[in-house]
A protein has these predicted regions:
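Low-complexity, glycine/alanine/valine/leucine- and proline-rich hydrophobic stretches
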Residues: 335-338
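Beta-rich carbohydrate-recognition and catalytic domains
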Residues: 22-133, 141-260, 269-333, 347-371
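Bacterial N-terminal signal peptides
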Residues: 8-15
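Bacterial N-terminal signal peptides that target proteins for export
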Residues: 1-6
């Protein structure tokens, strides 16, 4: 009872995450509220150390930044895998080494971290794709048999590549390499790919990877969102038109909050009204939404046909989450960021986990009963 009252109080005194809730279509999730007393929930930690097998030295692996989290519910707790950066490299976004840390929470708000990363560049067959930039920006889903499937970006400071890893316990991971390595004779290995949001169905507190028309589906990439299919969740093939050009299922719109770019967010979710895709959006200073800063990152929602995942039905006209708090505009990315990557149903509510200014992790909560 105390936990319930505490959460209710946090939501009551939290900050609204978006705008125009009265005009929110029925298919959209929200409104999400940012609990002010706990945010940011994960921040940089200069005391944590880790022996890097690649540099053969001890590094303070989460000293600079902790951000862009994936989330999953396991054994009655919320687990967050977050991107952590050390201070090596240039003082510039994308030029530090990233590793993935793991934290757990019994209430979805207060987290305890493991002292060392669970996924990192190692002296393995993926080293050529992951060193020296590291492993970035995870999203996670579960299979029917309890296997966890992680999409993440391999960054060797040359080409970012969307990759797959699997685990049974969230701690020990098997890397499977670039998601598109076997597609079209390997041509996608030379192209920038990232931000994979696999289609799921809700089963209790679990988001289970689900098939449509006999295939698994994944929305991915930036500045347009593309789509790929798979038979096994490991090897993926982007869909293309008759001319061999990849299909763009969601693109930027002049005059809107997503005028600069759109990028995959948390796992896509099958709902009664269709496939819900929460996505990240960037605003253009020249032809974007008036009143939003140039290059600010916000969040949007799109609805796709349940039987035809490439068919867009509707999309939001305004962001449902955007930088409003100091911690969302203070850090590596000062234009402001609410970069959504983790979404889980937990104890009757939806918890949305996001990166703030490429520096910290925030949470926003939606109670469907309050709609």
């Amino acid at each position: 009872m105390r936990k319930r009252l505490a959460l209710a109080g946090l939501i009551l005194f939290g900050a609204w995450s978006g705008s125009a809730d009265a005009q929110r279509p029925e298919w959209m999730f929200g409104p999400f509220v940012k609990p002010g007393q706990v945010n940011p929930i994960i921040a940089p930690n200069g005391a944590a150390t880790f022996f890097s097998p690649m540099s053969d030295s001890v590094v303070r692996w989460e000293e600079l930044a902790t951000f862009n989290p994936a989330a999953v519910v396991k054994d009655g707790k919320v687990y967050v895998l977050y991107r952590a950066e050390d201070v090596t490299g240039k003082r510039e976004i994308g030029f530090h080494t990233s590793r993935l840390g793991l934290a757990e929470s019994s209430d979805g708000l207060r987290f305890t971290r493991r002292p060392t990363p669970v996924l990192y560049p190692d002296k393995d067959v993926q080293a050529r794709y992951e060193w020296t930039g590291g492993v970035e920006d995870p999203r996670i889903v579960e299979t029917d048999d309890g296997t966890y499937v992680l999409t993440y970006t391999q960054w060797n400071r040359d080409v970012p590549r969307l990759a797959i890893a699997t685990s049974k316990d969230l701690v020990h991971w098997q890397k499977h390499g670039p998601a598109f390595a076997k597609a079209d004779s390997g041509k996608y290995l030379k192209l920038d790919t990232k931000s994979g949001a696999i289609l799921t169905r809700v089963q209790g507190n679990r988001l289970i990877a689900t098939k449509v028309n006999g295939k698994y589906w994944m929305y991915f990439n930036v500045p347009d969102i593309l789509i790929a299919t798979s038979d096994d969740l490991i090897d993926w093939t982007p869909l293309a038109d008759g001319d061999g050009k990849v299909l763009k299922v969601l693109s930027p719109r002049p005059g809107y909050f997503d005028s600069w770019l759109v990028e995959g967010g948390p796992p896509a979710i099958m709902t009664e009204r269709g496939i819900l895709l929460i996505y990240n959006a960037g605003n253009s200073g020249k032809f974007g939404q008036a009143g939003l800063p140039q290059r600010v990152y916000t969040g949007g929602q799109a609805l796709f046909d349940a039987q035809n995942p490439i068919k867009l039905i509707a999309r939001s006209d305004t962001p449902f989450i955007q930088p409003t708090e100091d911690y969302e505009r203070t850090g590596q990315y000062k234009d402001g960021t609410t970069f959504v990557e983790g979404l889980v149903p937990f104890n009757g509510r939806w918890f949305l986990y996001y990166g703030t200014a490429d520096s910290r992790v925030g949470v926003a909560v939606w109670d469907p009963k309050r709609r």
